Regions:
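Residues embedded in well-ordered regular secondary structure
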Residues: 3-5, 9, 51, 59-170, ...
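Extracytoplasmic gating/loop element in the C-terminal half of outer-membrane beta-barrel translocons
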Residues: 118, 253, 382, 699-759
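Short beta-strands and strand-coil junctions in structured, solvent-facing domains, enriched
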Residues: 3-4, 18-20, 38-43, 60-63, ...
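Short acidic/polar hinge/loop motifs at secondary-structure boundaries
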Residues: 9, 14-42
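Conserved C-terminal beta-signal and adjacent last beta-strands/turns
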Residues: 144, 582, 672-700, 726, ...
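Conserved small-residue
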Residues: 69-119, 362, 555-558, 572-673, ...
Length: 759
C-alpha cells in the first residue's frame, strides 16, 4: 500500500530477480525470508520499495550420492462463505410488498413453470450460485534428483500442476516445469554456475460476468427450458424475459458457457554466474547474467447464441493476442571481507544493468467460423471491421551501489548502504538512496549473564530511502489506457497509450524507519520478533484526469504513510524422542493514510472509491445514513424529504454541507477494505521422518463501514438476499420505531448502497 501503482514485492530466487513466482513449484522451495527493514532491502534497488522476498531452492550437496525425491498431493477447492440469496417464496413475498406491479413477473413464473400463487410456491426455485459452482480438483506432482561430487553440486527436476476452477464450466490451469541447477568449482580461484527454468502453462478462464449475473437474477426461473426448440438455441436456456424481466437480467449459466478464453505461456528463465576468488576468503568478484523470456498467446472467442433479446450474439467474435516479454539483468559485484581480533568488516561495491522490453500484437475479427480450433483464425473472419494493434515499450536501468558491514564480537553491528539508480522511466533520470542500520545483541553483555529469562536478545534499528520505478514506461506522457497483455488475471505486463500532454516525473521515494527486537526464552523454545515501522512515500506517482479530458496524466502528486507493528511468535518443543512440534502465530497492525495530494485533489474511482488526504487509500465513498424517517410529521418538517417525496421508512442521509440538498457534495468516506489487524497461525508437527501440517488460519479485520440491505428495486436491477428478507421492510409492523428501511420499487429513490446500520 505504499504506491498508487504496482505494490507487488520483489522476489529473489537463487539470486535472480522476478516480479512473480508463478513458475515456481512449492516443493522446490528450501527456504523463504521476508526482508522487513530498509537497510536490508536497500541493496536490491528500485524494485525493492514494496518489500523483498528471498527464496532459496533445493540443491545438491558436495560429495552426495544421487538422491531422488517425489512429492505430490491431491486436494479439492470449494467456495466458502457464499452470500445466501432469497428463494423464490422469499423473493415473491418481498417483491409484492415493495411493488404490487411485480405481480406480473411472479404470475408469469407460475404460469410458465408451475406453482401456486395463493401461497407463493414455485416449481422454479434456482440458486444461481449453486448452479455455477462446483467442487474442483487440484493435484501437483514433482520429481527431483540432486547430488554432488568433490567439486560440483547439481539438481534437476520436473513438476506438473493441474488445477480446475470452481466455476462449473471448462476452466482450468495446467503448468509443466523443468528446473536445473549446477555449481562447479573449476579452479580454486574460479567457480561457475547455472540456474534454469522452463515453464509451459495453459489456462482456460471463466466469464467473470456470470458471478454478478448470479447475484442479480432472481430464483423464479429455471436454468433450462426444454420447450424452447428454436434452431438458434445451441442449448435450451431459460431467459428472464420469459417472466418479463429485461434490461440487466441474464441467465448466468448461459453467460458462463458461451465463452472461450485461453492463454498459453512459454517462459524461459536462466542465470549464469562466474566468481573469481582473487584473495582466498577475502576478496572475490562475481559476475552474473539473468535472462527472462516469456511468450504468451491469448485467444478469446464468443460464439453465436440466442437466449433472449438482451442476451444474444448474432455473429462470432475472435480476438487473439501474442505477447513477448524480454528482460535481462547483468550484475557485477566485488566483495572484500576481513577480520582482526574481535572486529570483522565486509565491503561491497557493484554495478547493475537491466533492460526490459514488451511487445504486443493483437487482432480482432467477427464472423469467424465456429467449430474446431483449426478454423479460429483472424484471417477467416470478415475483413471489414477487423482491427490490428501493435503496442509495446522498452525500459532501461543502470545502478551503482556499495555496502559496508561492521561487526564487533557478534555484539555490535553497523551497516551502511548507498545506491545511485538510473531509470529511463523518469525524466529526472538518477536517484540517490542511502540507508543505515544498527543492531545490539544485549544477551552478549556481561550484565545479562546472570539472568535466566532471555536466552537471546537483539535490538535493531534502521533508516533508509528506497527508490521505486514500478510505474509506466511513459516518461511523463499522459497515459489514456492501461492495457492487459493477454486476457485474465494471471498476467502482470501492462501497456500504455501516450498522448502529447507532458509532465516532468521525478523519483517516487520511500522513506522508512524500523525498530525491532528479537528474543528467545524458555530454553530457546519460545522465539519472538517484534517490529515497528514507519514508511512514508514521497512524490508518489498518481494519474488524475486532466480537466475537460478523459486523459490521465502521471505526476508526482501524492504522499502515502504506512505505519504499524508486526509480531511473530514461534514455540518449538518435542514430546519424547521422536515427536517434534512447532506452533507459530503472526499478528500485524497497519495504519495506511494518504498524507497529501497536490492541490488537495480528490481522486474518485468509478464513483465508489476515493483517494483523499487524511483517509486510507482507495476508501469506499458514498452517502452516510444517519437514520430512518419515522413519521409523516418528521417527513413534512424536513425540506429534503419534501423535495424528494420521502415517506416513513426511507433513509435519512447526512447533509454534509447543510444546503438541504442531497447530491454529490454530500458523499463521504464510508470505510476501507484495507485490514487494520491481521493474524495467522500455523501448527506443525514432525514425527520421525514424516511430516503432517495443518493449513494456516488467516484472519483480518477491516473498517468497511455498514452497508444497506439491497432492498430498493430500481428499473434495471432487483437483488434480494436472504438477509434482506430477515431485516428489511416491515414498516407496517413498526409504526413508531422503524429500524428497517421500507420495501418499494421506484426510480430516483434514496435507498442506495450506503451506511445503514444492520442489527
Amino acid at each position: 500500500m505504499g504506491s498508487f501503482g504496482d505494490t507487488s514485492p520483489l522476489y529473489v530466487v537463487d539470486g535472480m530477480f522476478y516480479d512473480n513466482i508463478n513458475f515456481l513449484n512449492n516443493s522446490d522451495i528450501q527456504d523463504m525470508t521476508i526482508l522487513k527493514d530498509a537497510s536490508a532491502s536497500a541493496i536490491y534497488g528500485v524494485r525493492a520499495a514494496n518489500g523483498v522476498v528471498i527464496i532459496t531452492t533445493k540443491k545438491g550437496s558436495r560429495n552426495q550420492d544421487a538422491k531422488i525425491t517425489y512429492n505430490g498431493y491431491v486436494g479439492i477447492q470449494k467456495a466458502t462463505n457464499l452470500l445466501e440469496m432469497c428463494n423464490s417464496h422469499e423473493y415473491a413475498t418481498m417483491m409484492l410488498e415493495a411493488n404490487p406491479e411485480a405481480y406480473r413477473s411472479i404470475r408469469k413464473s407460475v404460469a410458465e413453470f408451475g406453482g401456486n400463487m395463493e401461497n407463493l410456491q414455485f416449481n422454479a426455485d434456482t440458486n444461481w450460485y449453486d448452479e455455477l459452482l462446483r467442487t474442483a480438483m487440484m493435484t501437483n506432482h514433482s520429481l527431483n534428483i540432486s547430488g554432488g561430487t568433490e567439486k560440483a553440486t547439481y539438481s534437476a527436476g520436473m513438476s506438473y500442476l493441474a488445477q480446475d476452477g470452481i466455476m462449473d464450466v471448462e476452466n482450468y490451469y495446467r503448468r509443466l516445469n523443468f528446473r536445473a541447477a549446477l555449481d562447479y568449482e573449476a579452479r580454486k580461484w574460479l567457480k561457475v554456475g547455472f540456474n534454469g527454468v522452463f515453464s509451459n502453462s495453459q489456462q482456460q478462464l471463466p466469464k467473470n460476468a456470470a458471478w454478478q449475473q448470479a447475484y442479480n437474477t432472481p430464483s423464479i426461473i429455471p436454468v433450462y427450458d426444454d420447450r424452447r426448440d428454436d434452431a438458434v438455441f445451441p442449448k435450451k436456456y431459460t431467459s428472464p424475459e420469459q417472466v418479463g424481466l429485461t434490461n440487466n437480467f441474464n441467465n448466468p449459466v448461459a453467460t458462463a458457457n458461451y465463452y472461450d478464453n485461453r492463454n498459453e505461456t512459454y517462459q524461459v528463465l536462466t542465470n549464469f554466474y562466474a566468481q573469481l576468488n582473487l584473495i582466498p576468503d577475502k576478496l572475490n568478484i562475481r559476475s552474473s547474467y539473468s535472462y527472462d523470456y516469456s511468450m504468451i498467446r491469448g485467444s478469446e472467442f464468443t460464439p453465436t447464441y440466442y437466449v433472449g433479446t438482451n442476451q444474444k450474439k448474432e455473429v462470432t467474435e475472435l480476438t487473439k493476442k501474442n505477447t513477448n516479454y524480454y528482460k535481462y539483468i547483468w550484475d557485477n559485484v566485488a566483495t572484500y571481507t576481513d577480520k582482526w581480533g574481535k572486529h570483522s568488516f565486509t565491503g561491497m561495491l557493484g554495478a547493475s544493468m537491466r533492460q526490459e522490453q514488451y511487445r504486443l500484437l493483437e487482432g480482432t475479427a467477427t464472423n469467424v467460423p465456429e467449430g474446431e480450433d483449426v478454423w479460429k483464425y483472424i484471417a477467416l473472419g470478415n475483413k471489414e471491421g477487423a482491427t490490428v494493434k501493435d503496442d509495446g515499450w522498452k525500459y532501461r536501468g543502470l545502478s551503482y551501489f556499495t555496502r559496508l558491514n561492521y561487526n564487533y564480537n557478534d555484539k555490535y553491528m553497523l551497516m551502511f548502504t548507498f545506491r545511485a539508480d538510473g531509470s529511463s522511466k523518469y525524466n529526472d533520470k538518477w536517484g540517490y538512496f542511502p540507508s543505515i542500520g544498527a543492531a545490539w545483541v544485549i544477551s552478549q553483555e556481561p550484565f545479562m549473564k546472570n539472568q535466566n529469562i532471555f536466552d537471546y536478545m537483539k535490538l535493531r534499528a534502521s533508516w533508509g530511502k528506497l527508490g521505486n520505478d514500478k510505474i509506466a514506461a511513459s516518461a511523463g506522457f499522459a497515459s489514456i489506457q492501461n492495457v492487459q497483455s493477454v486476457f485474465g488475471p494471471n498476467t502482470a505486463i501492462d501497456g500504455f497509450i501516450n498522448t502529447t500532454n507532458f509532465s516532468w516525473l521525478g523519483w517516487e521515494v520511500v522513506n522508512e524507519t524500523n525498530v525491532g527486537v528479537n528474543f528467545s526464552t524458555l530454553k530457546n523454545r519460545l522465539n519472538a520478533d517484534i517490529d515497528w515501522y514507519y514508511r512514508l512515500t514521497d512524490n508518489a506517482v498518481i494519474s488524475p484526469k486532466l480537466p475537460m479530458s478523459g486523459e490521465l496524466l502521471a505526476g508526482n502528486n501524492g504522499q502515502i504513510l504506512n505505519t504499524g507493528i508486526d509480531l511473530s511468535l514461534n514455540w518449538n518443543d518435542k514430546i519424547g524422542q521422536d515427536f517434534n512440534y512447532n506452533i507459530g502465530v503472526n499478528l500485524s497492525y497497519l495504519h495506511n493514510e494518504v498524507k497529501s495530494l497536490k492541490g488537495n485533489m480528490k481522486i474518485i474511482k468509478g464513483g465508489k472509491t476515493v483517494n483523499m488526504v487524511g483517509e486510507t487509500m482507495n476508501s469506499f465513498y458514498g452517502y452516510k445514513v444517519i437514520g430512518i424517517y419515522q413519521t409523516p410529521e418528521q417527513c413534512a418538517a424536513d425540506p429534503i424529504a419534501v423535495a424528494n417525496g420521502l415517506e416513513p421508512g426511507d433513509f435519512i442521509y447526512e447533509d454534509v454541507n447543510g444546503d438541504h440538498v442531497i447530491d454529490g457534495n454530500d458523499k463521504q468516506v464510508l470505510g476501507s477494505y484495507v485490514p487494520s489487524f491481521t493474524y495467522a497461525s500455523m501448527p506443525d508437527s514432525l514425527i520421525r521422518t514424516s511430516t503432517s501440517a495443518s493449513l494456516p488460519t488467516d484472519k483480518q479485520a477491516a473498517n468497511c463501514g455498514t452497508v444497506s440491505v439491497p432492498c430498493a428495486m430500481q428499473p434495471t436491477t432487483i437483488t434480494l438476499t436472504a438477509h434482506s428478507m430477515r431485516t428489511a421492510g416491515r414498516v407496517q409492523a413498526l409504526p413508531t420505531n422503524i429500524r428497517r428501511p421500507r420495501l418499494f420499487s421506484k426510480p430516483g429513490t434514496n435507498q442506495t448502497v450506503t451506511t445503514l446500520p444492520i442489527s
